[in-house]
């Protein structure tokens, strides 16, 4: 697989070509994903739940993400690699730059931050310092205690309108990817059309430019439960490589996620 860059994702958006991405945490799975030509991988703070057995993502540290980023980069030299900025690692622009520097040195091509309009200054500071940014909107798991649980976001008109404004603001601040989690498909479509950068969805319908799944959900090995927006591809195929290929095919064809994986 040739080396994937943000320019490739931009081209695919303009061409209407959908793409898939997966979370990864170690070199072996990263290598498997690259061999199947998964273009984008994310070292997610979801590792706190799926690897460390924590109830949420809040205990994850920058050092945790950096360690797993090094592992994933070792196994996938050509994928576009995003790394999550953990809870309270970007409270100020200055702290964000320090945290991002550690993750970029570990091998990330881009960092992902959760939040809305308040992130604009931080995103600008990061991009001015050559750190590409993915802005995560909708259900932001680091805010689970504010939301009172893992709930669909943007169902009321005011919240939806604000999310569209936030996406445009953060794109204008320098974000090169927008990630939408657990939002109605109609809202995801509005945002995807409103911004010129690629939009990746998880629980946001098949209307976004790309999709992402947590690998443990995709392989049906999550310890607790299967989110509605996910799909156990391993159960359907019986083989991990075939499972990844089927996921890629269905995303590119627009058949995943289907209505049963989508919120309205």
Swiss-Prot record:
Q: Which BP terms in the Gene Ontology apply to this protein? A: pantothenate biosynthetic process
> What are the alphabetically sorted keywords of the record?
Cytoplasm, Magnesium, Metal-binding, Pantothenate biosynthesis, Transferase
Keyword set includes Transferase = yes
**Cofactor details (free text):** Binds 1 Mg(2+) ion per subunit.
* GO molecular function (one): 3-methyl-2-oxobutanoate hydroxymethyltransferase activity
Q: Which residues bind 3-methyl-2-oxobutanoate?
A: 45-46, 84, 112
The cofactor required is: Mg(2+)
Reaction it catalyzes: 3-methyl-2-oxobutanoate + (6R)-5,10-methylene-5,6,7,8-tetrahydrofolate + H2O = 2-dehydropantoate + (6S)-5,6,7,8-tetrahydrofolate
Enzyme class at the top of the EC tree: transferase
Instruction: Identify the pathway.
Output: Cofactor biosynthesis; (R)-pantothenate biosynthesis; (R)-pantoate from 3-methyl-2-oxobutanoate: step 1/2
Query: GO CC annotation: what is one?
Result: cytoplasm
Localization recorded for this chain is: Cytoplasm
Q: Which InterPro entries match?
A: Pantoate_hydroxy_MeTrfase, Pyrv/PenolPyrv_kinase-like_dom, Pyrv_kinase-like_dom_sf
* Function comment: Catalyzes the reversible reaction in which hydroxymethyl group from 5,10-methylenetetrahydrofolate is transferred onto alpha-ketoisovalerate to form ketopantoate.
Tell me which NCBIfam families the record gives.
panB, PRK00311.1
Spell out the protein name for this chain.
Answer: 3-methyl-2-oxobutanoate hydroxymethyltransferase
Task: Output the lineage of the source organism.
Answer: Bacteria, Pseudomonadati, Pseudomonadota, Gammaproteobacteria, Vibrionales
């Amino acid at each position: 697989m040739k080396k994937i860059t943000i320019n490739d994702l931009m081209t695919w958006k303009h061409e209407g070509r959908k793409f898939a991405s997966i979370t990864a945490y170690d070199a072996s799975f990263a290598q498997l994903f690259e061999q199947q030509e998964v273009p984008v991988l994310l070292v997610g703070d979801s590792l706190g739940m799926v690897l460390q057995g924590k109830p949420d993502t809040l205990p994850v540290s920058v050092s945790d993400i950096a360690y797993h980023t090094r592992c994933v980069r070792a196994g996938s030299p050509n994928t576009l690699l995003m790394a999550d900025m953990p809870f309270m690692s970007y409270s100020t622009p200055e702290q964000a730059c320090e945290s991002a520097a550690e993750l970029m040195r570990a091998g990330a091509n881009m960092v992902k931050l959760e939040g809305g309009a308040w992130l604009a200054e931080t995103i600008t500071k990061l991009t001015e310092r050559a750190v590409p940014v993915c802005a995560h909107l909708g259900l932001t798991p680091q805010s689970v205690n504010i939301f009172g649980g893992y709930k669909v976001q943007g169902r009321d008109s005011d919240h939806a309108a604000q999310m569209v404004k936030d996406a445009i603001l953060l794109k204008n601040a320098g974000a090169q990817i927008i990630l939408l989690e657990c939002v109605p498909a109609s809202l995801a479509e509005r945002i995807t059309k409103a911004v010129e950068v690629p939009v990746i969805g998880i629980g946001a319908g098949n209307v976004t430019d790309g999709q992402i799944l947590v690998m443990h959900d995709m392989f049906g090995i999550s310890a607790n439960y299967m989110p509605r927006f996910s799909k156990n591809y391993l159960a359907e195929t019986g083989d991990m490589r075939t499972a990844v290929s089927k996921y890629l095919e269905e995303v590119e064809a627009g058949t995943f996620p289907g209505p049963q994986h989508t919120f309205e």
